[in-house]
C-alpha cells in the first residue's frame, strides 16, 4: 500500500494552504509555522505560467486526499469515461473512497488515520469488514466502527475533533452508535472552494 511518508507540513507549505494532513488538536499555523515555501530558496516565490498553475492545483488535490500520481490519473481516466462533468465526476470518485468517508464521518482525525483504520479492519461497510482504503462507497451504504475498535482512544479523540468541522450534507452520522450513512455523492457546490478541479481537467486533457 504505497503512501507518502515524508513531513506533512512541508506539503502544506508547498501548496500554500492547510491540506488537513495533521489532526486539528493544534492550529495549522502553529504546527507549520513558516509561511515560506520549503527548501533553500523558499522565500523566493516563482512566477507560474498556466501549466504551473494547473500542476500546483493537481498536486494540491492529490495530496489533500493522500493519493499517489498513478492512482490519481486512473481516477481522472475513469471520471472522463463517465457521463457529465469530468471534474465533478473526479471529485465524486475521490469523495467516495472509504478512507475519505471514514474521515468525513469523524471516525478519524485525518485521512491518513482513516486509511490505517480501514487497513487494520476496524471499519465495516454494510456490516461487513472492508480493509481496502480505495473501496468506493455507494449511496445508501452504511459505514460503522467494529465493536472491538470503538474504545480506541484515537477514535474517541477524532469524534471530539470532528465537532469543530462543518457537517457534510451528504453524510448522516450517529456518533453514539459509531455509525453513519453515505447518502449521496457530493457536487462541486458542496465541496471546498479552496481548489479548482477544472484546472486538473485542463492539465490532463492536453
From Swiss-Prot:
<dbReference type="InterPro" id="IPR018079">
    <property type="entry name" value="Ribosomal_uS4_CS"/>
</dbReference>
<dbReference type="GO" id="GO:0042274">
    <property type="term" value="P:ribosomal small subunit biogenesis"/>
</dbReference>
<dbReference type="GO" id="GO:0003735">
    <property type="term" value="F:structural constituent of ribosome"/>
</dbReference>
<comment type="similarity">
    <text>Belongs to the universal ribosomal protein uS4 family.</text>
</comment>
<keyword id="KW-0687">Ribonucleoprotein</keyword>
<dbReference type="InterPro" id="IPR005709">
    <property type="entry name" value="Ribosomal_uS4_bac-type"/>
</dbReference>
<dbReference type="InterPro" id="IPR001912">
    <property type="entry name" value="Ribosomal_uS4_N"/>
</dbReference>
<keyword id="KW-0689">Ribosomal protein</keyword>
<comment type="subunit">
    <text>Part of the 30S ribosomal subunit. Contacts protein S5. The interaction surface between S4 and S5 is involved in control of translational fidelity.</text>
</comment>
<keyword id="KW-0699">rRNA-binding</keyword>
<dbReference type="Pfam" id="PF00163">
    <property type="entry name" value="Ribosomal_S4"/>
</dbReference>
<comment type="function">
    <text>With S5 and S12 plays an important role in translational accuracy.</text>
</comment>
<feature type="domain" description="S4 RNA-binding">
    <location>
        <begin position="96"/>
        <end position="161"/>
    </location>
</feature>
<dbReference type="InterPro" id="IPR002942">
    <property type="entry name" value="S4_RNA-bd"/>
</dbReference>
<keyword id="KW-0694">RNA-binding</keyword>
<dbReference type="GO" id="GO:0015935">
    <property type="term" value="C:small ribosomal subunit"/>
</dbReference>
<dbReference type="InterPro" id="IPR036986">
    <property type="entry name" value="S4_RNA-bd_sf"/>
</dbReference>
<dbReference type="GO" id="GO:0019843">
    <property type="term" value="F:rRNA binding"/>
</dbReference>
<dbReference type="InterPro" id="IPR022801">
    <property type="entry name" value="Ribosomal_uS4"/>
</dbReference>
<dbReference type="Pfam" id="PF01479">
    <property type="entry name" value="S4"/>
</dbReference>
<protein>
    <recommendedName>
        <fullName>Small ribosomal subunit protein uS4</fullName>
    </recommendedName>
</protein>
<dbReference type="GO" id="GO:0006412">
    <property type="term" value="P:translation"/>
</dbReference>
<comment type="function">
    <text>One of the primary rRNA binding proteins, it binds directly to 16S rRNA where it nucleates assembly of the body of the 30S subunit.</text>
</comment>
Amino acid at each position: 500500500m504505497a503512501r507518502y511518508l515524508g513531513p506533512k507540513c512541508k506539503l502544506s507549505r508547498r501548496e500554500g494552504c492547510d491540506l488537513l494532513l495533521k489532526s486539528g488538536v493544534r492550529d495549522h499555523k502553529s504546527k507549520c509555522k513558516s509561511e515560506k515555501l520549503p527548501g533553500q530558496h523558499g522565500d523566493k516565490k516563482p512566477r507560474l505560467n498556466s501549466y504551473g498553475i494547473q500542476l500546483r492545483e493537481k498536486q494540491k488535490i492529490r495530496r489533500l486526499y493522500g493519493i499517489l500520481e498513478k492512482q490519481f490519473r486512473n481516477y481522472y481516466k475513469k471520471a472522463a469515461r463517465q457521463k457529465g462533468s469530468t471534474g465533478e465526476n473526479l471529485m465524486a470518485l475521490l469523495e467516495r473512497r472509504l478512507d475519505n468517508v471514514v474521515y468525513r464521518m469523524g471516525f478519524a482525525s485525518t485521512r491518513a488515520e482513516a486509511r490505517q483504520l480501514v487497513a487494520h479492519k476496524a471499519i465495516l461497510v454494510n456490516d461487513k469488514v472492508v480493509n481496502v482504503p480505495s473501496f468506493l462507497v455507494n449511496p445508501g451504504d452504511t459505514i460503522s466502527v467494529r465493536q472491538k475498535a470503538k474504545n480506541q482512544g484515537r477514535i474517541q479523540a477524532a469524534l471530539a475533533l470532528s465537532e469543530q468541522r462543518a457537517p457534510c450534507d451528504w453524510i448522516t452520522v450517529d456518533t453514539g452508535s459509531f455509525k453513519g450513512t453515505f447518502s449521496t455523492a457530493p457536487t462541486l457546490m458542496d465541496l471546498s472552494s479552496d481548489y479548482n478541479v477544472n484546472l486538473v481537467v485542463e492539465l490532463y486533457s492536453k
